[in-house]
UniProtKB/Swiss-Prot annotation:
It holds the Pfam family YbaB_DNA_bd. This is Nucleoid-associated protein HAPS_1040. It comes from Glaesserella parasuis serovar 5 (strain SH0165) (Haemophilus parasuis). Binds to DNA and alters its conformation. May be involved in regulation of gene expression, nucleoid organization and DNA protection. Homodimer.
């Protein structure tokens, strides 16, 4: 049922993958991603843990409508979160690649 190595081999693979995933999560938390809105007028940089690191607002927005600037900050933050999530999925997929799971079993369990 479990192929070469049996259940013991599968458990060893799972333990190794867990260690790799923990290391990858630590690395991801250190990475930074920047989201933009308003054609780059507002930029929000977050880390892999979705903590806001920096907000950049083009000075021309300060002369305009406050409500528009607030909307652009929210849109840039949401763009940064989306990009961070995509980056995290790509990085984690590389960790689970190559593990021979039984048919129908997915990770994380």
């Amino acid at each position: 049922m479990f192929g070469k190595g049996g259940l013991g081999g599968l458990m060893k693979q799972a333990q190794q993958m867990q260690e790799r995933m923990q290391k990858m999560q630590e690395e991801i938390a250190q990475l930074e991603v920047t989201g933009e809105s308003g054609a780059g007028l507002v930029k929000v940089t977050i880390n892999g843990a979705h903590n806001c690191r920096r907000i950049e607002i083009d000075p021309s927005l300060m002369e305009d409508d406050k409500e528009m600037a607030e909307d652009l900050v929210a849109a840039a933050f949401n763009d940064a979160v989306r990009r961070a999530d995509e980056m995290q999925k790509e990085k984690m997929a590389s960790v689970t690649a190559g593990m021979q799971l039984p048919p129908g079993m997915k990770f994380p369990f």
